[in-house]
Amino acid sequence: MAGRNQNRTVSLPGIQASGHVLAFGNCTDNDMLEEDAEVYELRSRGKEKVRRSASRDRLDDIVILTKDIQEGDTLNAVALQYCCTVADIKRVNNLISDQDFFALRSIKIPVKRFSSLTETLHPLKGRHILHPPPVPYFQEQDIVPADGSLSSSESAGSFLKEVDRDIEQIVKCTDTKKENLNEVVSALTAQQVRFEPDNKSIHRKDPYYGADWGIGWWTAVVIMLIVGIITPVFYLLYYEILAKVDVSHHSTVGSSHLHPGLTPPTQHREMENEIGPTKGIPVGQQDDHKLYRQDPQAHDAQHKT
């Protein structure tokens, strides 16, 4: 029984340094011989995998700055000054408590690689990087220059030469020698006036804009005056004249109906002399009509007799 117990001793499971391969030893020697090649690998899932990748990226992006501790510095003040956490400073400097900070002469501060602090702050004792920096790309460019840069520089040089040639031709064509200052001023003003139409044409308003039908403000004011003031005045005057003409026409027509044989001037003259109109009455009766107008009572007495 003792030998059997010795053969079937319990061995604890062993884990390799990598943390992924597990070997289970709770079995006999025969089982170990049969299953010595079988190993099991545990894959990381979910948050653990994300945490490992995040920690790896975080270590790649961290730069260690060294700062001498001065009088009045505290752990919280340094953390606020360099925008990092107190826990990160403790982890980098292997500090157990906050009081261990005062036993140090210099402190290491973890800062992100691409930040404003790494560009503006210059540490006193240099800068330490956790991982070696990659080979810069500009060195390869210096070793093997590109053809595109050469062609661009050549084209730029040729363009500048052409510009210089044009300037020389312009200087030769124009007479820059002036006898007095007035000629210089007149020449400069002429050039300014010559270039003014180009600038004005750029800011010129489109005549076919559409919102105002291409008319100016003064045209709109004239149209409003015509529509709002002049047209109503003419309308009122026209209707007043028509009313007066209608009244005079009706008066003349009424008088002509009462005395159809008289013309208006004769009728008016007879009415002023208090003589009744005689036109249209027979000639033999005109005298009787006049006498009747003069003495109607005598005429009535004659008829009674």
From Swiss-Prot:
Classification via Pfam families: LysM
Residues that span the membrane, as ranges: 217-237
Topology of the protein relative to the lipid bilayer: Single-pass membrane protein
Molecular function GO terms recorded: peptidoglycan binding
Parts of the chain on the Cytoplasmic side: 238-305
Cellular component, GO annotation: Golgi apparatus; Golgi membrane; plasma membrane
Glycosylation-annotated residues: 7, 26, 199
Predominant localisation class: membrane
Extracellular side: 1-216
Keyword Cell membrane annotated: yes
PANTHER family referenced in this protein's UniProt entry, alphabetically: AND PUTATIVE PEPTIDOGLYCAN-BINDING DOMAIN-CONTAINING PROTEIN 3-RELATED (PTHR20932:SF5), LYSM AND PUTATIVE PEPTIDOGLYCAN-BINDING DOMAIN-CONTAINING PROTEIN (PTHR20932)
Main function: Essential for Golgi structural integrity.
Name of the protein: LysM and putative peptidoglycan-binding domain-containing protein 3
Organism: Mus musculus
Gene: Lysmd3
